[in-house]
């Protein structure tokens, strides 16, 4: 699969495809990534912790999003392709899976495993239909509601730094065998 790994999304601002032999002209230039203050690997503990937090944020967002979650092999153990987002031509460590990463990054692996279990245990996160946000007397509230600093008042402006949402886990809404409002 083309594109940055999860680890590379938080470690590189730009692609590093020089080793591909195409003058870094291959691969997408729009990676929607942020290196957290330093390009590539670092020993700066503050940057490392920020990157790990960003990876947890991104993985959480993926697990609470509707649809089928898709991530790249190795994302759960912080696999990196060193900023190369187009490794089609490599039969080397850029594409070989490093099994030692499970031991090295056990904390992040366990976080990912727990988030997958969380998703599996909450039917409201695996709906068969899209949200519509319409209030229904039958369910007492809409399937999704949006909030800001005040309940029921989301601020969609670009200066807002707070957004929250609530999902209705009523089994009649989710179509699941059990209520998910706990």
PLM ranges: what are they?
Residues 2-182:
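Active-site and adjacent substrate-binding regions of carbohydrate-active enzymes
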């Amino acid at each position: 699969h083309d594109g940055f790994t999860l680890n590379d999304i938080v470690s590189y601002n730009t692609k590093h495809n020089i080793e591909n032999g195409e003058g870094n002209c291959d691969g997408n230039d729009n990676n929607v990534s942020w290196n957290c203050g330093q390009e590539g690997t670092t020993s700066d503990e503050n940057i490392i912790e920020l990157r790990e937090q960003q990876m947890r944020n991104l993985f959480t967002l993926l697990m609470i999003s509707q649809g089928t979650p898709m991530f790249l092999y190795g994302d759960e153990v912080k696999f990196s392709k060193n900023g190369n987002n187009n490794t089609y031509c490599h039969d080397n460590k850029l594409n070989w899976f490093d099994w030692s990463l499970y031991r090295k990054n056990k904390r992040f692996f366990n976080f990912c495993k727990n988030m997958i279990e969380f998703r599996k245990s909450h039917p409201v996160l695996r709906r068969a239909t899209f949200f519509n946000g319409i209030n229904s007397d039958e369910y007492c509230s809409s399937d999704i509601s949006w909030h800001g600093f005040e309940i029921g008042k989301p601020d969609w402006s670009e200066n807002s730094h707070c957004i929250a949402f609530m999902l209705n886990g009523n089994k009649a809404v989710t179509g699941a065998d059990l209520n998910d409002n706990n």
